[in-house]
Curated annotation (Swiss-Prot):
Gene label: ftsH
Name this polypeptide is given: ATP-dependent zinc metalloprotease FtsH
Residues bound to ATP: A159, G199, V200, G201, K202, T203, H204
Summary of activators and inhibitors of this protein: The proteolytic activity is dependent on ATP, both the ATPase and protease activities are inhibited by ADP.
GO molecular function, one term: ATP binding
Main location: membrane
PROSITE patterns per the UniProt record, alphabetical: AAA
Function: Acts as a processive, ATP-dependent zinc metallopeptidase for both cytoplasmic and membrane proteins. Plays a role in the quality control of integral membrane proteins. Degrades preferentially unfolded substrates in a processive, ATP-dependent manner, usually after hydrophobic residues.
Source organism per UniProt: Thermus thermophilus (strain ATCC 27634 / DSM 579 / HB8)
EC code(s) of this entry: 3.4.24.-
Gene Ontology biological process: protein catabolic process; proteolysis
Family designation: In the central section; belongs to the AAA ATPase family. In the C-terminal section; belongs to the peptidase M41 family.
UniProt-annotated stretches for the region Disordered: 595-624
SMART domains: AAA (SM00382)
Extent of Basic and acidic residues compositional bias: 600-609
Amino acid sequence: MPRAPFSLLALVLGLAFLAWAFSLAGTVGAPSGTVNYTTFLEDLKAGRVKEVVVRAGDTRIQGVLEDGSAFTTYAASPPDNATLEGWMARGVSVRVEPPQGQNALGFLWPLLLVGLLIGALYYFSRNGRAGPSDSAFSFTKSRARVLTEAPKVTFKDVAGAEEAKEELKEIVEFLKNPSRFHEMGARIPKGVLLVGPPGVGKTHLARAVAGEARVPFITASGSDFVEMFVGVGAARVRDLFETAKRHAPCIVFIDEIDAVGRKRGSGVGGGNDEREQTLNQLLVEMDGFEKDTAIVVMAATNRPDILDPALLRPGRFDRQIAIDAPDVKGREQILRIHARGKPLAEDVDLALLAKRTPGFVGADLENLLNEAALLAAREGRRKITMKDLEEAADRVMMGPAKKSLVLSPRDRRITAYHEAGHALAAHFLEHADGVHKVTIVPRGRALGFMMPRREDMLHWSRKRLLDQIAVALAGRAAEEIVFDDVTTGAENDFRQATELARRMITEWGMHPEFGPVAYAVREDTYLGGYDVRQYSEETAKRIDEAVRRLIEEQYQRVKALLLEKREVLERVAETLLERETLTAEEFQRVVEGLPLEAPEEAREEREPPRVVPKVKPGGALGGA
């Protein structure tokens, strides 16, 4: 059956070719002996032409010479009566034939060809609906995936978003028993917009709603609607909602709705581009739901600031549910969910791992456990150990360890003092985070890093931010103190310090010279954000100077601290050169001057030192 459209197309092309061939069948083929018009006139004057045949209105002249040979020539214009009489005066037999009537197929074959093609397209559109790949107009059909069976995911499989689940339980009750709400005259929200940074589980939560309510789940992406063909997006929106009505009660989920729901008038093409037509159709369809239609539209975005206001008004996306990165309790619950089916060793402490992964979202935690499982399988172990999880966390944050990279003794020494500087500043500064781990094992683009012991915190004080800047600058300060020289390793440290200092001045009102004034508006908070400048060039110069002074003050402060703790700095750096990695407990013992236990495993022998391309030292908080 799938080959039928191709057979029909071959038939159409064959008929078109026959029509063209028949159109030429009635015409006289060009005979042999074609001569130019000058030769014909010379033969005419010489009396060698016996007979000519002309057709009225035709420039072609056919004839026979005295020797019996046939010829054909072409004049610039059809011969007139005077010309023909002149030829007859020379004794030439002239026969004039009426204009040749084109056969019907020859005259109508272009129209016939067009008609056949239109008929074929109509056939495709009518009979190819069984499968989108067989239909000539399948690009107007929605690309949504319809899961007629309820997803197996339920609220039990979602963690770290308890408030969002509470908000959505009402939607679940409506989908389970819509008549109860209709009898009370209640109008359930037509649309629910899930807002949050990437990876927090917006799509997972939408599937859980469908699974909890046991209704079909229809999912599409915002980019599925917009195409280069005008009107395709609107047609796909109509088809999507027609599909939803056939499967009601159901959930329609549109992921990354900002691809189609961007504010109108802000893109290329003004009010006439394809994306805006698609958005208009989406608005119309959401308005077109009858009161008793049990269809709930859910959408997800991490850019709510660019959505069209008409999309967010009551009656469309009535509710916006913000889903943020989980706290320590939520992270532990997420880890336990993703740890199902994975053999964990007895030393695994998921609560401790949750404390050590602030800022991780659900996707990060799932990836962490998967990396740990891969590491355990690679090493031939039958269970995942805490060491595997720690290594996986480092891989997720900083990249895989470059065990084959052998540094020169000078580079290792610089890296050790650089990271020791970060660690001592984080340890001794009152409002800093403390040290979770410090290492000089290269990872990603870093030759080493200091991982701070951060906690979930929503409010950052001015003193804490100043200490953060000082910790970021401590690596460069240690280099200057020990080597009386500086390297390029603090590039990323400077970026972090400068960004914090600038935001303290322009956004958070933490500088006495500028006061509680917002000089910049930060947009797009879920994707890292960018600043919209709202001040003059003169103010910009003052801000730049204030940023420089603030950073210089913190640099001198942390440099003085490291000079005071020079002996401890040497001790930590030398221990790093010996052991490469220090945990929080080991670092504390080194700072206090206590001996360390021997490593559990013998260190693998390294290759002889060799010169390698310079890679910038730094850390999770510090260098690049």
